[in-house]
């Protein structure tokens, strides 16, 4: 029996859209680069509505260790691909250091300012 230990790093993508379409794009990307991810359905509740979507998880898997920068780069690429196929305008990536909000909208208005 073998135990492998690597530094912990987790990165999550949050994206609205059809989970089946997003899962298929994740399969394509994972097959292309050799990657293992998790996908969980989620519900976003926001001012004025709600929308179903996904939480996609990436980790530093000790069987195939990687750097945090590389994992984050893969998350950004995957998020962009999933956003496009799901016909969405934005995604969110959360890791221990940063939260990245990416939108292809030409407007972003915060109510109350």
Region roles according to the model:
Residues 35-72:
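Short, intrinsically disordered low-complexity segments
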Residues 15-19, 62-65:
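A generic structural motif
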Residues 2-6, 17-19, 24-33:
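N-terminal intrinsically disordered, cationic/polar leader segments
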Residues 65-108:
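Short, compact, well-ordered microdomains
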Residues 30-37, 84-89:
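Short secondary-structure junctions
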Residues 14-16, 40, 59, 94-95:
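A structural detector for beta-sheet-dominated domains
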Residues 7-16, 55:
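Short glycine-/aliphatic-rich beta-strand segments at the starts of folded cytosolic domains
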Residues 51-55, 100-113:
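Short, low-order "capping/linker" segments at domain edges
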């Amino acid at each position: 029996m073998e135990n492998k230990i690597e530094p912990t790093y987790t990165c999550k993508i949050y994206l609205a859209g059809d989970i089946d379409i997003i899962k298929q794009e994740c399969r394509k990307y994972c097959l292309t680069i050799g990657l293992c991810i998790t996908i969980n359905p989620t519900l976003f509740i926001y001012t004025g509505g709600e929308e179903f979507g996904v939480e996609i998880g990436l980790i530093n898997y000790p069987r195939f260790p990687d750097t945090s920068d590389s994992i984050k780069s893969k998350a950004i690429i995957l998020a962009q691909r999933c956003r496009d196929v799901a016909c969405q305008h934005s995604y969110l990536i959360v890791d221990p250091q940063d939260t990245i909000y990416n939108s292809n909208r030409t407007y972003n208005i915060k109510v109350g300012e």
